[in-house]
Amino acid sequence: MTEQINQLSLSSIPIAPEGFKSGFVGIIGRPNVGKSTLMNQLVGQKIAITSPVSQTTRNRLRGILTTEEAQIIFVDTPGIHKPHHQLGKILVQNAEAAINAVDIILVVVDSSIEAGGGDRYIVELLENTETPVILGLNKSDQQPQNYQPIDESYLVLAQAHNWPVIKFSALTGEGLDNLQKTLINLLEPGPYYYPPDLVTDQPERFIMGELIREQILQQTRQEIPHSVAIVIEKVEETPTLTRVFAAINVERDSQKGIIIGKKGAMLKAIGTAAREQMQKLITGEVYLQLFVKVEPQWRQSSLRLSEFGYQIET
């Protein structure tokens, strides 16, 4: 992998100059409002998978933006929603825990539609927080001509708490310079937490697994994406070749059949696309071999959830 996502080397963390600022920014919001796309844009590299399917993000991801004057660690959280299984409960608990573990909270909403019950629920969660909050109106590029009533539905929520409001498009990058400046202004003086050239603290295997899961999200539909867990079982590396062996875990035989596809066509397509994404991050050639396993009701099993890397984060 590139230097940015190699394991953290404490010796490469410099001493911050006088006046340098740093801190953690929690990105929260309903599912599918563009939180992961936003973080990818802010750090300048794809570290969080994106998909039109809601609840794409399952873990609290950290993305790191370092400028001459500040280091901002963005924490991308799972979308806050009403959970329907044990996995969902863990995701929501982790997202809510992030609210109490950051220096600034960035609430991201979809400004192509009016505020709804999910947005108001998040505002209620933040009712008594002492952490600075910014309301970010994302998807400004997708707003209809008569967008004023939509904006007003969110401005009412922000004005009740004196939250600053910033409008932007995570997809096009419009307005993100203003967002970055606002965040830096709110940060306190602080040290470098990570080397300046690092963009995420996630290990290589996690990134590999997420790239595979992203292709499943993009190439399958309905219940399949939420029933999938990826386990990187083995990685073999030489100077010119990285061999990755990964298991795709599903809950039912029918789901296994869909992922494999007719004569293995779907599995091949998933593997080819995921390998191409890995190739952008890894020096040398990449060989990716995928297996599909059935683990009945793994989303309801505390043991399986832990084995697959899903647990309450502190």
From Swiss-Prot:
Pfam families: KH_2, MMR_HSR1. GTP binds at residues 29-36, 76-80, 138-141. Residues 55-59 are annotated as: G2. The keyword Plastid does not apply. Residues 29-36 are annotated as: G1. CDD domains: Era (cd04163), KH-II_Era (cd22534). It is found in: Cytoplasm; Cell inner membrane. It is a peripheral membrane protein. Residues 168-170 are annotated as: G5. The keyword Membrane applies. SUPFAM superfamilies: P-loop containing nucleoside triphosphate hydrolases, Prokaryotic type KH domain (KH-domain type II). PROSITE patterns: G_ERA, KH_TYPE_2. Keywords: Cell inner membrane, Cell membrane, Cytoplasm, GTP-binding, Membrane, Nucleotide-binding, Ribosome biogenesis, RNA-binding, rRNA-binding. Gene3D superfamilies: 3.30.300.20, P-loop containing nucleotide triphosphate hydrolases. GO terms for molecular function: GTP binding; GTPase activity; ribosomal small subunit binding; small ribosomal subunit rRNA binding. Its main location: cytoplasm. GO terms for cellular component: cytosol; plasma membrane. One of its GO terms (biological process) is ribosomal small subunit assembly. Residues 212-296 form the KH type-2 domain. Monomer. An essential GTPase that binds both GDP and GTP, with rapid nucleotide exchange. Plays a role in 16S rRNA processing and 30S ribosomal subunit biogenesis and possibly also in cell cycle regulation and energy metabolism. Belongs to the TRAFAC class TrmE-Era-EngA-EngB-Septin-like GTPase superfamily. Era GTPase family. This is GTPase Era. It comes from Rippkaea orientalis (strain PCC 8801 / RF-1).
